Regions:
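Structured, hydrophobic secondary-structure cores that serve as assembly/anchoring elements
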Residues: 10, 16-19, 25-33, 55-368
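Short linear interaction motifs
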Residues: 35-60
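Extreme N-terminal leader/targeting regions
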Residues: 1-5
Length: 368
């Protein structure tokens, strides 16, 4: 198919004619009768099964420094929704158990397997597919859905329909590296895809389609859309960055889930360093002094507005303990409570435009 695209591109974009092209290999035109192959023919591998996908998830457990996990292009390799959902369920259960990663699910851009047709999904098809997935795997703050597909120019200069997961990973990692994982990677500041050419699905980013886009958001669909920007015209971007949590608290925002993962991944090695040290308030004070600059920086970076570290770090005797108790401490156990006030991504801006009809005169002054 790529070779056919190359010929098509040469005819339409370069040659601008419909004249037939002559292709030669080794100075000769290839024919059906003359096929030459030099080398050793290998054994073609089979498409992985759902069980093989699930077994491969176990290998991820060796790595806890990542934030984003996905089964890339799984809907292209597995031809039935039943098999796809089976893998998604196993991945979701692993992420919920370990609480180390966020798992991203791509809503297939076509209504059928690509070998059976290439009809793009519309709003209702997207919602139906997510509902089917939720019915199989359930809701989770560690799972997020991305939909819409995306159009790119391929290496031959031809506009092609693509999956979005690679782009989503790029947005998430770039945002985390430059701004911190606690910042949303959607919207006009960190979610613009400058070489994207719009979604495969209908563009629900138009202002006239606000209700449809909002309906998709209510069903946890984070969409690829085209929107007008203040200074760069129309741009392709990711709009919304929600998890699939049912409870309407701050962890319905993927940025807050990622903040909690950041806290876990950052504080864990510091706390582990103090294992086997004397379990006494002097050690607790040292722990607090080591983590305090990290937490202060999170306040400065608008990850949280304030925090409270409650770990009896100021105690001087067992009688002054409030979070811990003497019995547990003397068994080598130490407990800390970290409370913070989160800062969530802005989702709605309301401006009231009022015409003042009370005044009957207008004064115009000119500054010289």
């Amino acid at each position: 198919k790529s070779f056919e695209n190359l010929v098509s591109w040469h005819q339409t974009a370069i040659d601008q004619t419909e004249n037939p092209l002559t292709i030669q290999v080794g100075g000769k035109e290839p024919t059906a009768e003359e096929v030459m192959f030099n080398g050793i023919l290998g054994t073609a591998g089979a498409d992985p099964t759902a069980d093989e996908w699930i077994a491969s998830l176990d290998l991820v457990k060796d790595y806890t420094d990542i934030y984003q996990l996905s089964c890339s292009h799984i809907h292209q390799h597995l031809k039935t929704d039943q098999d796809v959902l089976k893998v998604h369920k196993a991945a979701k259960e692993m992420c919920a158990e370990l609480q180390e990663y966020t798992y991203y699910i791509e809503v297939p851009k076509y209504t059928t397997h690509y070998t059976q047709g290439t009809q793009p999904r519309n709003k209702q098809n997207i919602i139906t597919w997510i509902n089917s997935c939720l019915g199989s795997i359930g809701n989770s703050k560690y799972v997020a859905y991305f939909a819409g597909g995306i159009k790119y120019y391929n290496e031959f200069g031809l506009l092609s329909n693509s999956d979005v997961m690679g782009t989503i990973f790029g947005l998430g990692d770039t945002s985390a590296s430059n701004y911190g994982p606690w910042k949303s990677f959607a919207g006009m500041n960190r979610g613009v895809i400058y070489d994207g050419q719009g979604p495969v699905s209908p563009n629900y980013g138009s202002d006239s389609r606000y209700n449809e886009l909002n309906e998709l958001a209510q069903m946890y669909a984070n969409m690829i859309v085209i929107k007008d920007t203040p200074s760069s015209g129309k741009q392709t971007m990711l709009w919304h960055c929600f998890s699939s949590q049912v409870k309407q608290d701050s962890e319905r925002f993927l940025s807050i889930v990622r903040l909690n993962l950041y806290l876990k991944k950052t504080l864990r090695p510091i706390l582990n360093k103090y294992l086997e040290e004397p379990n006494i308030w002097g050690t607790w004070k040292n722990i607090y002094l080591e983590v305090k600059p990290i937490l202060d920086n999170l306040v400065d970076e608008n990850a949280m507005s304030e925090y409270t570290w409650m770990g009896d770090q100021d105690a001087g005797s067992y009688s002054e303990l409030s979070v811990n108790n003497e019995a547990d401490v003397r068994q080598g156990k130490y407990k800390v409570i970290l409370k913070y006030k989160d800062i969530v991504p802005m989702q709605e801006i309301t401006i009231n435009i009022v015409i003042d009809a009370a005044s009957k005169s207008v004064n115009i002054s000119e500054n010289e």
